[in-house]
């Protein structure tokens, strides 16, 4: 199982989303939509072995975590507007400590970025933090029977405190490129690496 989590520092935390202004008034929700696209959509199929989390820290009610489960997703199209509509529905739910399903395979909860990562660590997932200054990809060995969580930052990053948290947790810091990449591009590169193990 492949899982991804992104800290969305400015992404809105209620359903008041302007679909005509995803990058601006919605707190770079366009970036989140592109990550969902990269996590799940193939040319004529979807990745069913993937889960994607976004933890939104924008106004008015942070944090709100969103969970997308590939094996359960239905009716979502790959374009940003369609994905944003489904995110809007999820954010219209009153978030609580429990995951609440808004539409098939999409859930929301009142959870912190660190809490989800800690939970995945306790489940035995191998945690990778994707960072420009990490060890080169070639230095790591991946096995097809392992479960992974890949941690991503948005255009702002995850911040020093969360980086320290990941280091203390034993997350492996990995670099996919000598150049700084967009989060959605990193997801595609990770998928490509793991696809080749099959």
Swiss-Prot record:
Keywords: Cytoplasm, Methyltransferase, S-adenosyl-L-methionine, Transferase, tRNA processing
Leading EC class: transferase
Compartment(s): Cytoplasm
One Pfam family per UniProt: Methyltrn_RNA_2
InterPro entries attached to this UniProt entry: Alpha/beta_knot_MTases (IPR029028), TrmY (IPR007158), tRNA_m1G_MTases_N (IPR029026)
GO BP term, example: tRNA methylation
Keyword Glycoprotein included in the entry's annotation: no
Membrane-spanning residues: none
GO annotation, cellular component aspect: cytoplasm
Principal subcellular localisation of the protein: cytoplasm
Catalytic function, reaction form: pseudouridine(54) in tRNA + S-adenosyl-L-methionine = N(1)-methylpseudouridine(54) in tRNA + S-adenosyl-L-homocysteine + H(+)
The protein's Enzyme Commission number: 2.1.1.257
Source taxon at top rank: Archaea
Methyltransferase is among the record's keywords: yes
Biological role stated in the UniProt entry: Specifically catalyzes the N1-methylation of pseudouridine at position 54 (Psi54) in tRNAs.
Similarity comment: Belongs to the methyltransferase superfamily. TrmY family.
Assembly description: Homodimer.
Protein name: tRNA (pseudouridine(54)-N(1))-methyltransferase
Source organism: Methanococcus maripaludis (strain C6 / ATCC BAA-1332)
Native organism taxonomy: Archaea, Methanobacteriati, Methanobacteriota, Methanomada group, Methanococci
Gene expressing this chain: trmY
């Amino acid at each position: 199982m492949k899982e991804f989590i992104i800290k969305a520092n400015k992404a809105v935390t209620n359903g008041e989303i302007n679909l005509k202004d995803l990058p601006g008034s919605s707190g770079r929700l366009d970036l989140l939509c592109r990550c969902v696209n990269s996590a799940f959509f193939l040319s004529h199929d979807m990745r069913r072995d993937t889960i994607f989390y976004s933890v939104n820290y924008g106004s008015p009610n942070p944090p709100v975590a969103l969970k997308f489960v590939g094996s359960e997703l239905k009716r979502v199209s790959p374009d940003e507007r369609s994905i944003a509509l489904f995110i809007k529905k999820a954010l219209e739910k009153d978030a609580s400590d429990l995951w609440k399903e808004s539409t098939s395979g999409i859930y929301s909860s009142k959870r912190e970025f660190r809490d989800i990562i800690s939970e995945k660590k306790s489940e035995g997932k191998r945690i990778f933090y994707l960072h420009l200054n990490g060890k080169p990809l070639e230095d790591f060995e991946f096995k097809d029977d392992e479960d992974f969580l890949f941690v991503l930052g948005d255009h702002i990053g995850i911040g020093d405190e969360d980086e320290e948290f990941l280091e203390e947790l034993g997350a492996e810091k990995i670099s996919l490129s000598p150049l700084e990449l967009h989060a959605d591009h990193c997801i595609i590169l990770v998928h490509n690496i793991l696809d080749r193990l099959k």
